[in-house]
Amino acid sequence: MPRVKRGFKARRRRNKVLKLAKGYRGARSKLFRSATEAVDRALNYAFRDRRVKKRDFRALWIARINASARENGLSYSRLVHGLKKAEIALDRKILAELAVTDPAGFTAIADKAKAQLQ
């Protein structure tokens, strides 16, 4: 069998990793082994945290909705139940945005939900 020379492929693979490690401090941006470890870890964190971000934002929205709901004499769970009964299909992101930017609009929605609970 003929000998396989991998100079070009190996260099291209190493350069790809070093390019991803650009901007890292010290040896992590210069040495292939350190860069490989740093890039692997960074990509794992990025993958994980893209999912964690969704959880964090949902928790933030719920906290904001709950605070505004309590100002209107409802708990979060009763507000959501009332909205479902009133067939008001607003998601948590929009409700939280309303609670922060348009308290009067949120109060109107909360009153409709409250009316459905009576």
UniProtKB/Swiss-Prot annotation:
InterPro entries, A to Z: Ribosomal_bL20, RIBOSOMAL_L20_CS, Ribosomal_protein_bL20_C
Domain of life, per UniProt, equals Bacteria
Q: Does the keyword Cytoplasm apply?
A: no
UniProt KW keywords: Ribonucleoprotein, Ribosomal protein, RNA-binding, rRNA-binding
Per the record, what is one GO cellular component? Answer: ribosome
Pfam families, alphabetized: Ribosomal_L20
Q: A GO biological process this protein is involved in?
A: translation
Q: Which CDD domains match?
A: Ribosomal_L20
Gene3D superfamilies linked = 6.10.160.10, Ribosomal protein L20
Q: Which GO terms describe its molecular function?
A: rRNA binding; structural constituent of ribosome
Cited function: Binds directly to 23S ribosomal RNA and is necessary for the in vitro assembly process of the 50S ribosomal subunit. It is not involved in the protein synthesizing functions of that subunit.
Q: Which family does it belong to?
A: Belongs to the bacterial ribosomal protein bL20 family.
| Entry protein name | Large ribosomal subunit protein bL20
Species annotation: Syntrophotalea carbinolica (strain DSM 2380 / NBRC 103641 / GraBd1) (Pelobacter carbinolicus)
